[in-house]
From Swiss-Prot:
Family in the record: Belongs to the ankyrin SOCS box (ASB) family.
Domain SOCS box span(s) in chain numbering: 586-635
Main location: cytoplasm
Record-given protein name: Ankyrin repeat and SOCS box protein 2
The UIM domain, residue ranges: 26-45
Organism of this sequence: Homo sapiens (Human)
Protein's gene: ASB2
Recorded metabolic or biological pathway in which this protein acts: Protein modification; protein ubiquitination
Induction data: Induced by all-trans retinoic acid (ATRA). Induced by Notch signaling. Repressed by microRNA miR-29c.
Gene Ontology terms: cellular component: cytoplasm; cytosol; nucleus; stress fiber; ubiquitin ligase complex; Z disc
GO biological process: actin cytoskeleton organization; cardiac muscle cell development; cardiac muscle cell differentiation; dendritic cell migration; heart looping; intracellular signal transduction; podosome assembly; proteasome-mediated ubiquitin-dependent protein catabolic process
Amino acid sequence: MATQISTRGSQCTIGQEEYSLYSSLSEDELVQMAIEQSLADKTRGPTTAEATASACTNRQPAHFYPWTRSTAPPESSPARAPMGLFQGVMQKYSSSLFKTSQLAPADPLIKAIKDGDEEALKTMIKEGKNLAEPNKEGWLPLHEAAYYGQVGCLKVLQRAYPGTIDQRTLQEETAVYLATCRGHLDCLLSLLQAGAEPDISNKSRETPLYKACERKNAEAVKILVQHNADTNHRCNRGWTALHESVSRNDLEVMQILVSGGAKVESKNAYGITPLFVAAQSGQLEALRFLAKYGADINTQASDNASALYEACKNEHEEVVEFLLSQGADANKTNKDGLLPLHIASKKGNYRIVQMLLPVTSRTRIRRSGVSPLHLAAERNHDEVLEALLSARFDVNTPLAPERARLYEDRRSSALYFAVVNNNVYATELLLQHGADPNRDVISPLLVAIRHGCLRTMQLLLDHGANIDAYIATHPTAFPATIMFAMKCLSLLKFLMDLGCDGEPCFSCLYGNGPHPPAPQPSSRFNDAPAADKEPSVVQFCEFVSAPEVSRWAGPIIDVLLDYVGNVQLCSRLKEHIDSFEDWAVIKEKAEPPRPLAHLCRLRVRKAIGKYRIKLLDTLPLPGRLIRYLKYENTQ
């Protein structure tokens, strides 16, 4: 039979389970469900039966106590609830998992307070029982009465022990604090009328007024303010009650606080005012209220971030619009020198960017060392990129050196960001607006080659990218474009067709003489050069000797020979060719003199120039000759 717990005016049942729901389950399934239930109960805390019993005894609805940080009283040992189905199953199969201990009966004093039994309390007092003695958690019966909302019991204890009205628990919580947290207004009013201090805070320096604002309890706030609660008290984070009510957009509570003397310009430990909180959290109505009462629209936190900056950062469009309409300064920078337009571009909010463009100083942007174009391109915000370019932002503005150093490749242009992201549309957009593809330490063309994106390569070359790009920090005797394309012969041929210079690949310092041992690739090609040592120039033959490239040495040399005249293979290259008998034809191909037609083709292409190779089709020559010049027919 289920255990019944009766209270005045209501009756609740606990421990009663619908066993028919589980009649169709096998024993294994029941065991599995029991394990899951036990884990859930352990995570949740008290059992369902205990929670139900508590709710019935308190005569409170299930939704009464929704707050995550509310103070809970120390639980006296409750009566043992009957064993449910899951516990029974688990005890049957594993007595070692569940050892149900006999719990002590409930404390009569606590039971009397929970039940609101004033006569029982009076009887205990008459019998000489000391009801002003705290338990191990520092709780008095007065605290229990305030927590459970038993105003009759509270008054009995107040009259019997008036000196305990402001006594604190070990968590430094007073009866006023507990009554406020639980929303028991009659208890709160009774305590304040009896002379309780309204401003005693807990260990976190949170006062009853602060907790009332946290719970959005306007009546409790009104009662506390009427009894002279300090409206400007700060918690350990420096927050006031007004900060808390603003964060919850509670206009009614805000009005009570401001009318009660709350300062609209009070700052927390980080220099944040209530208006800053409203802008940061997107509370437009609270923002309007504070502006009406004279709060500073241009308030800044300790890191110099303005309210407008935070609103842009969190993409609160209506808040940004309101702040700008009230004259907010869009040219205040944070500690990193960034403006609201920077963060809006980084977030990719087109509407906010459009609002900020007319009111943002280009001089301030230049001083910041980073253009909004960089941030939009870095995050692939193409729509914002279009808006900035339409507003005539300089597409070639470089990152400041101190900002470029934050990137390992020392990138500086918005174009580089677009190419790194493999964003073909943004790359084309920037190039159409005049982006210079040759401004970065590492050419964007090399990045495009590494990605293998022919469309991006073609765009960069069409807009003047140097096809013979080198890397200053890792010097080579031959173009880095060839080095990056070596592992893909079709890509290498594509670049050579467009005019890449292959001659330096065969200009070896050692010629037919002995070559020094090749250094390890990890120390030569991948590591950054030492600061106190000038990096040595890597020869082509040295690079193709790397283990990851050497197996392709023959085909690579074969492709390059189609784009050079009479050259001399060094001893190292000959060694590679001789290492595989099928490559013997490559050695024969390199022997001078090269065919006259081939030499003439090279002479014509050189006269045209690598930047005009794409104009070969316009020459007044036979189609067959044009194809030969373009290497479309190499026979």
